[in-house]
């Protein structure tokens, strides 16, 4: 897909989910905010991407660019504090981080017992963190950003997109709900799991509902791996990763096919075709940083 310079320096952001790897996106956003040359119209995020989106929106609303940088730092610092230092150890290669054996054993129970049994009281430290950091009532009333948060209906597999007027702590928790660890988050009588199963992230709302033609994709999942997995655990992790990127890749292929069709058109372009021709994608990916990291680092 083609790219160009946007004379108005306004962009949309599409923020991929990826657990703790979302700290990479925090770094990207911090750099963009510090640079100061870009404005933002819409932000679409899934899971950790959704958390980055609302933290950034909260900060922009209360303190401009500096406020957004402060809000993101505050959020990720508080999130890191929820993980005990004893939970991780240095991996054998000396570069990666691995879970301590005791915590690995705890996670293995998730292969045998549902969240209803492992976590009957549905304890989730993320809930306290999100509600403490984000003023959703004020965000819904005052935010200038168009926000889109993806979750997956646990009964149908369909995408549920929460827009700014619908945003709440439950919507963010739904977008980040791993079904093997936490119970489905119920909203309006429907259960929701992690948005990555349906859109990671959703790009189409930035095309249909925003005027800005430039979309910056911040990707956490490697577009290609160096090695083929061989152990059972590594294969499971690769399959799960593919499940979380398949919908995004399909969506991007659709845009690419439409752009190719429009570029070859022999007829006058309508409004939709002109919008396709005038949409530009830009990518910042974590390939060089994330491709060697194990799933445990998430």
Q: Whereabouts are the PLM-identified features?
A:
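Catalytic nucleophile loop
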Residues: 40-58
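Non-catalytic peripheral regions of patatin-like phospholipases
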Residues: 7-11, 61-129, 163-167, 190, ...
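Helix-rich "cap/lid" substructures immediately adjacent to catalytic or cofactor-binding pockets
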Residues: 1-43, 130
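Active-site periphery "cap/insert" segments of enzyme catalytic domains
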Residues: 117-144, 149, 160
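A short acidic-Thr-Gly-centered motif at the start of a beta-strand
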Residues: 3-5, 138-142, 178-189
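Short, hydrophobic alpha-helix immediately C-terminal to the catalytic nucleophile
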Residues: 26, 53-54, 203-204
């Amino acid at each position: 897909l083609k790219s160009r310079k946007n004379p108005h320096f306004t962009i949309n952001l599409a923020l991929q989910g990826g657990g703790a790897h979302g700290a990479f996106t925090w770094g990207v956003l911090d750099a963009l905010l510090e640079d100061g040359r870009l404005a933002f119209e819409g932000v679409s995020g899934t899971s950790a991407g959704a958390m980055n989106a609302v933290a950034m929106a909260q900060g922009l609303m209360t303190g401009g660019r500096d406020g957004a940088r402060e809000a993101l730092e505050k959020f990720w610092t508080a999130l890191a504090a929820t993980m005990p230092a004893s939970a991780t150890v240095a991996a054998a290669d000396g570069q990666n981080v691995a879970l301590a054996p005791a915590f690995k054993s705890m996670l293995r129970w998730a292969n045998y017992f549902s969240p209803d049994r492992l976590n009957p009281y549905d304890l989730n430290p993320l809930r306290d963190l999100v509600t403490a950091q984000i003023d959703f009532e004020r965000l819904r009333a005052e935010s200038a950003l168009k926000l889109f948060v993806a979750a997956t209906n646990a009964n149908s597999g369909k995408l549920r997109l929460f827009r700014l007027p619908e945003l709440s702590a439950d919507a963010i928790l739904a977008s980040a709900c791993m079904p093997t660890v936490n119970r489905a988050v119920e909203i309006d009588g429907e259960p929701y799991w992690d948005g990555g199963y349906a859109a990671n992230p959703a790009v189409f709302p930035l095309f249909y509902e925003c005027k800005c033609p430039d979309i910056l994709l911040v990707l956490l999942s490697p577009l290609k791996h160096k090695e083929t997995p061989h152990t059972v655990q590594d294969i499971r992790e690769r399959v799960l990763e593919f499940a979380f990127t398949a919908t995004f890749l399909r969506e991007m292929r659709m845009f690419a096919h439409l752009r190719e069709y429009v570029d070859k058109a022999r007829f006058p372009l309508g409004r939709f075709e002109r919008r396709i021709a005038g949409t530009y994608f830009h990518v910042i990916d974590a390939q060089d940083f994330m491709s060697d990291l194990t799933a445990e680092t998430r």
